[in-house]
Amino acid sequence: MTINFIKKKIFIINNQNKIIIFLLIFVIILLLSLKLSPGKDWDVFYSASKLLLEGKSPYNYETFGNPPWSLIISIPLVIVFPKKIAGDIWFVIGIFFFAITAYRLHAKPIAMGLFLIAPPTVHCLLNGNINWLPLFGFTLPPYIGLLFILIKPQIGIGLAIYWIINAYKSGGFIKVIKIILPTLIAYILSFVLYGFWIKNMFNIYKVSKLWNTSLWPYSVPLGLLLIIFGIKKKDPTWVYGAGPFLSPYVLFHVWDAVLVSLLRKTWILFFIVILLWIIVFYKL
């Protein structure tokens, strides 16, 4: 017991600066959240969750266009807490998932801190969006992760292609089916229960097309190149950022996926985060 206690103390002492930096970032972003109302995207998830709890289709809320399992975390919050408090907790959960994703992808503490204060991350958190859930899917086995990363296809489509091609190369169609079957069943059941809810995505596009930052179709070759590089090098890190380049609809916070691909390249991440903040302040 004494030896284990001493080891824990040594670990804390050796990592105290890293721990302090992380806690400071967490507290600053949290305080900023508490000063603001929950973001408009939280309104969407809150309203869709309430409809589901009332036995109605969450897609009656016309700007909810994610699969029904994207509400797995918001539903308990809606049951227990008022909207504002639930929104604040949602914000904290977002920070946790962003941080745990960076940790599971072997980011150094400085890289994790840069990722948490990057403009796309802050934008996602303040708007109450859910990018942290599909990004967390990057760290899961493909047969589970596919369910998560396709919550936002503009984030996960590149990695989905990579997983499927890798599965085919290593185990043929049988392995591909094993990977895609849980997600395929989930989508089929959702269509049976709620109809072709994907049409709501077009409503989202109409509402937010003014904020579309997609570089499509000019960015498609780059997205495909990242997938090819990842397959050749057998390294999914290359593919993490491919999704936004392949999608015709990309809001600013979706570019977080590109930052995830740079979590193990601290200096590059540092300069990109600084550049993004310069652009943000210039545009204000």
Predicted feature descriptions by range:
Residues 2-139, 143, 164-266, 270, ...:
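Primarily membrane-embedded glycan-assembly and transfer machineries that use lipid-linked glycans
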